[in-house]
Amino acid sequence: MRLTYFGHSAFLLELARTRLLFDPYLRENPHGSVDPKSVPCDLVFCSHAHSDHVGDALELARLHHAKIVAPYELAEHFAAQGAETIDLMPGGGVTLPWGRIDMTPAIHGSALELGDGKTLSMGPPSGFVVRADGQSLYHAGDTALFGDMRLIGRHGIDVALLPIGDFYTMGPADAVEALHLLRPRLAIPMHFNSNPKIRVDPHRFAAEARRTGHPVRVMSPGETIEV
């Protein structure tokens, strides 16, 4: 698996037969604007409806003829605008020719921002477990720590992408606790330092995680690694 980080919670996962883009906050990403044309993908994953996770999903779908994977209500919103979608709900999943997607619960919100302080609920927030090429990756979306992370990790997770920014999601201490439940081969922090409220030192999180036996890689925006 080849993984590229764009900052915030946006990642591109390149598998042997497909390219998956998670929470595609590209053009307006505070870590550095990325042109959606420059990120070819086959599936676009949106964990929930907040603008920093929906990002450029519709534009990417149109540019690259990609399908959008999202919770049912959010997928219906995209479908009404002409996108092809795969609609799931937490606890459900789908097997595709290249592998399997399972949608996991998350503890957060999922409202579409309509402007003038108005919002529209778009169903539950979510995370995703992807299994392909003999490996697995968990993108937690935006979430608090919750005990059923132990169930998510029960069949083995190779790479876990976890929010650590606090304020709107779990912070570093709870993210370390999440690692005790998930037991991934490698953890990568996300959703931090993209606005003043969620400023944390990811290297302090990494040091504490390593101290308790959990390998961590802190990725820089624009960095690509093999996992």
UniProtKB/Swiss-Prot annotation:
Pfam families assigned to the protein according to its UniProt record, in alphabetical order: Lactamase_B_2 (PF12706)
InterPro entries in UniProt: Metallo-B-lactamas, RibonucZ/Hydroxyglut_hydro, UPF0173, UPF0173_UPF0282_UlaG_hydrolase
Residues forming coiled coils: none
Keywords, sorted A to Z: Hydrolase
Keyword match Hydrolase: yes
Keyword Thylakoid: no
One example GO MF annotation: hydrolase activity
SMART domains according to UniProt: Lactamase_B (SM00849)
Protein family according to the UniProt entry: Belongs to the UPF0173 family.
PANTHER family: UPF0173 METAL-DEPENDENT HYDROLASE MJ1163 (PTHR43546:SF3), UPF0173 METAL-DEPENDENT HYDROLASE MJ1163-RELATED (PTHR43546)
Identification of the protein by name: UPF0173 metal-dependent hydrolase Oter_4201
Organism classification: Bacteria, Pseudomonadati, Verrucomicrobiota, Opitutia, Opitutales
